[in-house]
Amino acid sequence: VKSQQIKYPTLTTTRTYGDKLYVLEVIRDLDEAIDLICQTMTPEEQLDPFAEDLCPYFGVLWPAAEALAQYLSDHAMLIKNKKVLEIGCGLGLPSLVASHLGGKVLATDFHPDVSEYFLRNCRHSSMECNYQRLNWREKNNSLGQFDVVIGSDILYESKHPREVAMGLMRFVSPGGTIILSDPGRSYLQQFLTAMNEEGISEEMSSIKISQQEILIFKFRI
């Protein structure tokens, strides 16, 4: 299954953190967008396990991304002058916030369409940010290590928890920090257990976004 570079209907929305207004182009309607991509696939392609990875979930501004952005804004000293990696960046709001706070940010995602939307949002918010396509499930790491690794709502599949734990560890430099936001996914505890088994404990807090409690986890490596 190949990405079709579909021109999904979009709209713009804004968020403000600190003194900075962020303008984001988002997919107008996720169900409509999924219907559009399904129309480009044969019935056989729709059954391909990889087809799910091409669904444009990246185009939604999820509460977990907003919560992570808010947390970073509230804890700017965790980011300032640090080398920062975001995995699964989607629209890129946390990366934009981290960049504005003085982080040297590399935003990454696996979906082939993310780069176009992320770079648009950089322009909309009058910012310059670096982006690279990355499948963090792969064991090879050509990116090197980072002071801070961030991610929002990345524990959405059963196969992810230990892979995420091991993947994150590969990207964090000794003495570095991992910051994740999660809406309470069912695989969260498995991930925390995997991190604990590596001798890494977490500090937990929460942020409410649109009446939804989002958990924030900070790990010191």
What residue ranges belong to the model's regions?
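S-adenosylmethionine-dependent methyltransferases
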Residues: 1-221
